[in-house]
Amino acid sequence: MATPTSSPTPDLTRAAEVIDLARRVVGKGVRTLAAQGGPDVHQVLAYDLAHSAAAVETARSLIDYGGKGKSEALITCAFVADMLHEVSTRLLGREDMWGVEQNPLASAHDFMTAFREPEFLASLASVAGPRHLEDEFEMVQDTFRSFATKVIAPHAEHVHRHNADVPEEIISGLAELGAFGLSVPSEYGGFSEGGDGEYMANCIATEELSRASLGIGGSLITRPEILTRALVNGGTEAQKQEWLPKLASAEVMAAVAVTEPDYGSDVANLTTMAVKGTNEEGVEGYIINGVKTWCTFAARANVLMLLARTDPDRSKTHRGLSLFIVPKPLGDAHGFMFKQPGGGKMEGRPIDTIGYRGMHSYEIAIENWFVPADHLIGEESGLGKGFYYQMSGFENGRLQTAARAVGVMQASYESAIEYANNRKAFGHNIAEYQLTQAKLGRMAVITQASRQFSYTVAKLMGKGEGQMEASMVKAYVCKAAEWVSREAMQIHGGFGYAEEYSVSRLFVDARVLSIFEGADETLCLKVIARRLVEESAAK
């Protein structure tokens, strides 16, 4: 049983000092990494530094939040202590690798001790903390939570257990709410007026939909969002007029065809080719050949956003890639094969997965598939720019994935606290035991910290900034979701392993978060660590 105790007094000034200390230590590690050959040479060091830097930035984003009230300050101090513990754990025994002295974080140990006390964490078990959203975003949250609760949640378990399809009522309902037009500029039939509002609205909506179901909720708006960003950044005016209104209304649903069997996160070296040619009617365009994999929602989608090599010179790597909008018929979720009059063929094989079910993922073999020339994003001026257009969409995709992770965490926490308050063991509800309370407290703290960091990144991206932070929030929050969902399952005991409890679905769904939208290792080594080294050299 937990022993009642008074909480330590939150000290945000001291918390900021602790964050600054951790930041300086990580900075020394980055400079050492740069001096010794960089991320490709010292991958373990680079990975640890990337995750440490992401944890530090998560903590830094909480300082303003902590100043808004007592519970907010307690959550902030608890997370800063948790961050310090994570960085210390990665550093311990590797001080020489980092290029730092022994115990470089020792001056902050008193803070870590005070705010990692089991009694203190236990006191936070039911302190989720307010979100502090502006009125317009409160409305977004209420609207999407209501829809998710009434329409998505009732289908979540059936779709997961039977690997069923996304019900059409969910797609049509989201379309009526304008979910697919949140990032489409208003002049093209969407709701975006620019600024941080569109990123925040998307982030909040995605969390609420994912809280009900990752597979048939939060992920539905990600793929149209990625194509929308690519069109806004690189499309011709005619292409924007043609496609953006259809994406906003869900008349057109999109899937992303980038990854290949031998080229997962190594996008720059993919091999699918698009060669200029004509169809049987003499229309000019491109003929595509290659194999794409992990194309989620490809059967139900009307178009594929497909990245292909238009320059046969492989030495040009990412500079030889172009981005296409590839129309296709609707297909059967269990597999599909389409033929064009001129002989083109597209065949999709479903990939069975342990979780994240409903949208279904496919390996797609494409043979002599014709697309008109005006389906190349940017048309002639878009040749060789596909990688950049795609990445502009993926950056926001990483933020959305973090928001999806927050939704899964929130659902996991709610499931755990409800079960703990009703399950008795040894004569008491398990929620009364200190170990359970401490777990719930840490879950609440990490979930709110992850949410606030995602809000911070959304605001940065609304200003045209935050590309690095988008990768960091994805790296930190998705790993955190694995821990939160695991502990939620553990609190359920044996019932957590039973399909009749939703926490088992949340656990397997959470596992995909650090794999898709940029595998964690690739994100840390090729994006975060590399950028940290570049920034260090520029100082």
Regions found by a protein language model. Name each.
Residues 1-17, 27, 132-133, 196, ...:
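FAD-binding core of flavoproteins
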